[in-house]
Design a protein with these regions (language model features):
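Single-stranded nucleic acid-binding surfaces, predominantly the OB-fold ssDNA-binding core
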Residues: 1-197
Length: 197
């Protein structure tokens, strides 16, 4: 299971052959806007214009790529299967079933909030797996920190974009963006997998 619904404003539409890449700007209840990278076939986008409000249905996907620094990076995006009319409010709802593929990172923020970073491997049928970053707060952070590698979980939340500061040894500070599922609900399920990752 890997399903996401996004409703918001489409922008930065780029067509390359039969592939279309674009960004969905989705407003939270707080007013903050998440900018989510999306990809679809040109036949799905039809005549969608920059600035148009739409609803997208698809899956959270990830792919590794080599950056300018020659290091491997993880791209998180939404593979859009269906585009429908906008229904009057922004939406960002995701449900993913998968396995914890590396040990959870439980810690406290500088403001003393509990936080837990996880990577969930979600099987894509015969096409391999997507390795999806997730972040949990407070009580969810404490509970998810107790998961073991290979344990099956169902996660509900939103796909968010979050800016953070990357500090290098030479003192340079770079603003970067993380894309991850912010967990609002989770449960364990009977699946488990040995040697995940």
């Amino acid at each position: 299971m890997n399903n996401i619904t996004l409703a918001g404003e489409a922008s930065s539409i780029t067509v390359t052959g039969e592939k279309v890449e674009f960004v969905m700007a989705v407003k939270r209840l707080s007013g903050f806007i998440d900018y989510i990278n999306c990809s679809s076939g040109i036949h799905i986008m039809n005549d969608v214009m920059n600035g148009e409000k739409i609803t997208c249905y698809g899956e959270v996907r990830t792919v590794n790529y080599k950056g300018d620094d020659e290091k491997s990076h993880l791209k998180v995006y939404v593979h859009v299967n269906i585009i429908a009319p906008y229904e009057g409010e922004d939406k960002n709802n995701v449900t993913v079933q998968g396995f914890l593929c590396k040990e959870a990172n439980y810690r406290f923020t500088p403001y003393n909030r509990e936080i837990c970073d996880l990577i969930i491997a979600s099987n894509r049928n015969s096409q391999g797996s997507d390795y999806i970053p997730c972040i949990a707060w407070s009580k969810h952070a404490k509970r998810m920190a107790k998961l073991y590698v290979g344990e099956g979980v169902n996660i509900t939340g939103r796909l968010q974009s979050r800016e953070y500061e990357k500090r290098y040894e030479n003192g340079v500070v770079e603003i970067k963006t993380a894309y991850e599922i912010s967990v609002t609900k989770f449960s364990k399920w009977g699946g488990n997998r040995e040697n995940v990752g």
